[in-house]
Amino acid sequence: RFLYMPGIIDSPDAKNFYYKELKRFVNELESLFGKRITDDDLREAIQIYDENRSMIMKIFHDRKNDRPIISGKEAYLITLSSMLTDKQDHNKLLKELLQKLPDREPLKQGVSRVMLVGSPMDNMKLLELIEDDIGAWVVTDDTCTGTRYTWGETPSTYLEKDPLRAI
């Protein structure tokens, strides 16, 4: 079965629908694997994911500088690797990267600064065209596989009493 997510996510009805979907999903996982998922398990996972998003946002923030030290292609690969790698392992890698980035040389001067807007990107061809062929910098984006992936921490208002609602 699928985990359904409403198209409009800001309304109270959509939030309640999604909460019920998450509860159903947790119940199915518990039944399938014979292991209870506790509130503490959820809180720990939320903390790990929030830490991951926070570190990615720090890296992405550098792209706005006059001379960024990370390219749009590299930013895309960081996000993609976050989607495909165990979050605890990815957090370790991000911590190492954050320690090394200040020593990195800024990118060579680009011809233009570009904001990429669109839907999820499933490959890097557009980024390669912009950065390698044209010589511009993709300094920010508004895509699901870019900055939107890191938007917002989990609301702490629900975290203590109902971590599933916080998700």
Predicted regions and their residues:
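Gly/lys/ser-thr-rich phosphate-binding loops in alpha/beta enzymes
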Residues: 1-28
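Acidic, Ser/Thr-rich peripheral helices and adjacent loops at domain boundaries
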Residues: 155-167
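Short, charged, surface-exposed secondary-structure boundary motifs
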Residues: 10-14, 147-154
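A charged, amphipathic alpha-helical module
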Residues: 19, 23, 27-152
